Regions:
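Short coil/turn connectors between adjacent alpha-helices in alpha-solenoid helical repeat scaffolds
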Residues: 160-162, 198-207
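Alpha-helical repeat scaffolds
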Residues: 205-216, 244-249
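N-terminal "domain-start" segment that seeds a small globular fold
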Residues: 228-260
């Protein structure tokens, strides 16, 4: 009897503990075909792994998970196997006990509405809403790009140019918003993406503005993992090439003999 009571109490305690760490994501969308597969990815830095899948029926989908040890899950919702969707995702932040509702009226998933009590989500939503019209236009181009995979290079190049133009406008709006907001983890994530443009896009026009935003961070933020990644993008180390002049210096071997680099 005691063993049965102990087992029951242990099971009850486990269920209570699990419930305290659970969060749910409930979706209600229109304009999406029944049978559309929805994938939920858990993000760790720039790497994502599939943690759940559901099929949209009558415009609904549902996920239930336990939050990770740090208490905040960064998730990505995608419908990549459907050509009606852009090659983009919906970013979701989840914490224990959060009841998250996702709504949409079309297949433009990146701008579906996420109603959530999680503060990181609320802050992230501000960036999306600030450029909602541009993001929708960008997604429509992304969907069109799927149908042009076999089109002539000139046509695909023209489409990419339109995407780049819209992306630049989004960056401009985001930087203006970032000037008004306090520095936070979400803020730094946006700065990281801007720093990637500085590093890899030779046509990116806002390097000085990005550097000014970087200088808003305090030392603790600059020395964080994200802060260091931003710095590497903005201030890449100089690579010495063959033929470049090097500063000479004296080096001593174990026998005390002097050697020079040049």
């Amino acid at each position: 009897m005691k063993k049965l009571l102990f087992s029951s109490l242990f099971l009850f305690g486990s269920l209570v503990s699990q419930a305290q760490h659970e969060y749910t994501i409930e979706g209600k969308v229109e304009g999406v075909k029944d049978g559309t597969l929805v994938s939920l990815f858990l993000l760790d830095g720039n790497v994502g792994s599939t943690v759940a899948m559901d099929t949209i029926q009558n415009g609904t989908f549902f996920f239930k998970r336990n939050a990770g040890e740090d208490g905040l899950d960064k998730l990505s919702l995608m419908c990549t196997r459907n050509d009606d969707f852009p090659s983009m995702s919906l970013e979701i932040y989840a914490t224990p006990k959060a009841r998250i509702k996702v709504t949409g009226t079309n297949t433009l998933i990146h701008t579906w509405t996420v109603d959530s009590p999680v503060k990181e989500q609320i802050e992230y939503n501000r960036f999306i809403e600030d450029s909602h019209d541009l993001w929708d236009e960008y997604q429509r181009l992304s969907i069109k790009a799927r149908s042009l995979r076999s089109a002539p290079e000139g046509e695909r190049k023209a489409l990419r140019a339109k995407e780049d133009s819209i992306s630049a406008l989004i960056s401009k709006r985001e930087m203006k918003l970032m000037q008004e907001l306090p520095v936070s983890n979400i803020w730094m994530d946006r700065l990281y993406k801007l720093s990637m443009s500085v590093k890899y896009n030779p046509n990116f026009s806002y390097k000085d503005e990005t550097l000014a935003l970087y200088n808003r961070m305090n030392e603790a933020q600059k020395t964080s993992i994200t802060g260091q990644e931003i710095a590497v993008n903005l201030f890449p180390p100089t690579v010495v090439k063959e033929g470049d002049k090097m500063a000479d210096t004296e080096l001593f071997d174990l026998d005390g003999k002097i050697h020079h680099l040049t």
